[in-house]
């Protein structure tokens, strides 16, 4: 029943995690039969996963998955009388803070932007992204009304998302 309280992109992300990472393992087991040892086994499988290039899931992605299953059990405790959340006894997985981001130096950016000097639309877009630090979705949601050339300001108050093939602008 949380769908109405979430932005479409957030809801789609949560649904994906539930459908791909939680339901295949726990979907047919009653919640009150899931034990902390089951959660630990599942966590260990996720932390051991490697893709075809040998890369594991990032620590922040693991934390996001773990937060989702913890929230499901918290909801069951609060609204459906589940005695306790097995995730609390199992412990956490992953880490909250993302890896430190790497940024281009001005020289690196100048090398990159030279390729777009004859493409004004892309040149303006990449210059704006680099010098403001806005995200791609925020950039794609901008309208002419958001830009005040006299005050040299850009109002960033919405985000572009593609959710299940549907293009959305969210605030």
Explain the meaning of each model-derived region.
Residues 17, 45-48, 68, 114-118, ...:
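Residues within well-ordered alpha-helical secondary structure of globular protein domains
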Residues 157-158:
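Radical SAM [4Fe-4S] cluster-binding motif and immediate context
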Residues 31, 87-90, 168-171:
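Short clusters of hydrophobic/aromatic residues that line enzyme substrate/ligand-binding pockets
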Residues 152-154:
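Hydrophobic residues embedded in beta-strands of well-ordered beta-sheets
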Residues 98, 164-171:
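C-terminal catalytic core of Y-nucleophile DNA break-rejoin enzymes
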């Amino acid at each position: 029943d949380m769908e109405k309280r979430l932005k479409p992109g957030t809801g789609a992300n949560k649904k994906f995690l539930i459908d791909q990472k939680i339901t295949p393992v726990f979907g047919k087991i009653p919640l009150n039969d899931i034990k902390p040892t089951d959660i630990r086994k599942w966590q260990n499988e996720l932390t051991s996963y490697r893709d075809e290039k040998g890369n594991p899931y990032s620590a922040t992605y693991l934390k996001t998955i773990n937060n989702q299953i913890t929230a499901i059990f918290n909801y069951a405790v609060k609204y459906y009388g589940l005695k306790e959340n097995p995730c609390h006894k199992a412990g956490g997985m992953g880490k909250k803070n993302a890896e430190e981001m790497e940024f281009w130096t001005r020289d690196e950016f100048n090398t990159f932007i030279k390729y777009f000097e004859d493409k004004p639309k892309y040149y303006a877009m990449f210059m704006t992204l680099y010098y403001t630090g806005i995200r791609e979705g925020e950039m794609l949601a901008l309208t002419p009304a958001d830009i005040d050339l006299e005050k040299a300001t850009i109002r960033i108050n919405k985000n572009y998302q593609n959710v299940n093939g549907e293009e959305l602008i969210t605030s």
